[in-house]
Structure formats: structure tokens, C-alpha cells
Amino acid sequence: MKILIFIIASFMLIGVECKEGYPMGRNGCKIPCAINDNICKTECQAKWKQSDGYCYSPGMSCYCTNLPEDAEVWDFSNIKCRG
């Protein structure tokens, strides 16, 4: 019985994922950053209170985690950057 409860609980946890992505500036572009810069955390939390952020080094752009599902983030297939 305990194993059955454990399996059901495991399946429920697998489906729990938070949205992540690059926040956009006013011009629709990704927000540039430098490594070890706190601007990303500040930018992410200014838009979405419960989120966190860091500078993603390969692209040198801010990246936000723990976003709500309706959060608008930069999307490669729909680039709106006017920069």
C-alpha cells in the first residue's frame, strides 16, 4: 500500500514544472548582462515577484526561473527585438 502511494505521489511531482526563459526589455530584445551581476535577479523579480534570475553566460543574457505560465518571455521563433 505504501508503495502505491509513493508511485502516485511521484507521478504527481513529475508534472510540476515552472516556466523559464529570457525576459524581454522594452525593445523586445533579451536583457544583456555580465557574469556575477545581480541585475538579472532584480529584473526578473521586478516583473514576477516569485521568480529568480541569473546571467546565462553563453548568451550573456538574463535568464529567469520559476515564472508563472502566462509570463511573456523571449522566443526565438517569434523575435520582436527592435534593437
UniProtKB/Swiss-Prot annotation:
CDD domains: neurotoxins_LC_scorpion. It is found in: Secreted. Residues 1-18 form the signal peptide. Residues 19-82 form the LCN-type CS-alpha/beta domain. This is Putative beta-neurotoxin RjAa17f. Keywords: Disulfide bond, Ion channel impairing toxin, Neurotoxin, Secreted, Signal, Toxin, Voltage-gated sodium channel impairing toxin. The lineage of its organism: Eukaryota, Metazoa, Ecdysozoa, Arthropoda, Chelicerata. GO terms for cellular component: extracellular region. GO terms for biological process: defense response. Disulfide bonds join 29-81, 33-55, 40-62, 44-64. InterPro entries: LCN-type_CS_alpha_beta_dom, Scorpion_toxin-like, Scorpion_toxin-like_sf, Scorpion_toxinL, Scorpion_toxinL/defensin. Expressed by the venom gland. The keyword Signal applies. Belongs to the long (4 C-C) scorpion toxin superfamily. Sodium channel inhibitor family. Beta subfamily. PROSITE patterns: LCN_CSAB.
